[in-house]
């Protein structure tokens, strides 16, 4: 209900996972929107719309793999390594951009983005699995010493409700964040003549997601290991 939605907005786990979910789900949206424009701008001799569907298609296909891996290895660890890949891929794409005296490499550029799309897809699945586990775990801890099965079941229901509310809110935040990617490309090109600045910025953002995942959820003594 509305009360649960309002309460969850004040929860720090809500904002942590919104940050990470923006890195995966938001990136999927933004990359899909911005990739054709970026290729056509940097490699004008190529019609990017002939193959622009490949990245989003691969991301959608591998999303279930992220959930499957999260169930077996742990969502936080999968998400951590996904953000490692996502931090490197934009720098690789920037390396293959055309520069003065060089035509760049379309193949290298596209492959770097394919890696970014696949990582975003897998990470979308793994972060999606993390959210309900986080809130269920926190609620279970509150009644763990009561030795009361009814209290435990009630706590799990509350955790499930909070997890569902967080998924909805995080999805909205991530979708909004996804619109930033094409805007960042355009701004970088307008100011510097190249999207390289935007790509470096994205790499730094994914690095922050990687470090956040490790600190909050992946390390052995994390607040909520999942």
Please give the residue ranges for each predicted region.
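Extracytoplasmic gate region of multi-pass secondary transporters
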Residues: 11-64, 124, 128-129, 181
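Transmembrane alpha-helical segments of major facilitator superfamily
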Residues: 51-59, 170, 174, 205
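Helix-to-loop junctions at the C-terminal end of transmembrane segments
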Residues: 62-75
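C-terminal transmembrane helical hairpin of 12-TM major facilitator-type secondary transporters
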Residues: 76-127
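Intracellular juxtamembrane helix-capping segments at the cytosolic ends
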Residues: 122-155
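A late C-terminal transmembrane helix in Major Facilitator Superfamily
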Residues: 145-191
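A membrane-interface helix-boundary motif in multi-pass transporters
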Residues: 185-206
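Multi-pass alpha-helical transporter architecture, strongest
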Residues: 201-226
């Amino acid at each position: 209900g509305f009360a649960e939605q309002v309460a969850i907005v004040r929860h720090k786990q809500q904002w942590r996972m919104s940050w990470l979910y923006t890195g995966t789900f938001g990136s999927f949206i933004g990359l899909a929107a911005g990739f054709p424009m970026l290729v056509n701008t940097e490699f004008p001799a190529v019609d990017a719309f002939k193959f622009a569907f490949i990245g989003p298609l691969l991301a959608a296909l591998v999303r279930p793999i992220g959930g499957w891996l999260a169930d077996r290895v742990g969502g936080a660890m999968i998400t951590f390594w996904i953000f490692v890949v996502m931090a490197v891929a934009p720098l690789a794409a920037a390396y293959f951009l055309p520069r003065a005296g060089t035509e760049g490499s379309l193949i290298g550029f596209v492959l770097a983005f394919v890696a970014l799309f696949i990582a975003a897809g897998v990470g979308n699945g793994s972060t999606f699995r993390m959210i309900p586990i986080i809130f269920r775990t926190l609620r279970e801890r509150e009644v763990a010493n009561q030795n009361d099965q009814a209290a435990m079941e009630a706590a799990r229901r509350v955790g499930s409700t909070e997890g569902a509310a967080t998924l909805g809110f995080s999805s909205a935040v991530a979708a909004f964040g996804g619109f930033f990617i094409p805007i960042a490309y355009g701004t970088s090109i307008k100011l510097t003549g190249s999207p390289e600045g935007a790509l470096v910025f994205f790499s730094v953002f994914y690095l922050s997601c990687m470090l956040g995942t490790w600190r909050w959820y992946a390390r052995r003594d994390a607040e909520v290991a999942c």
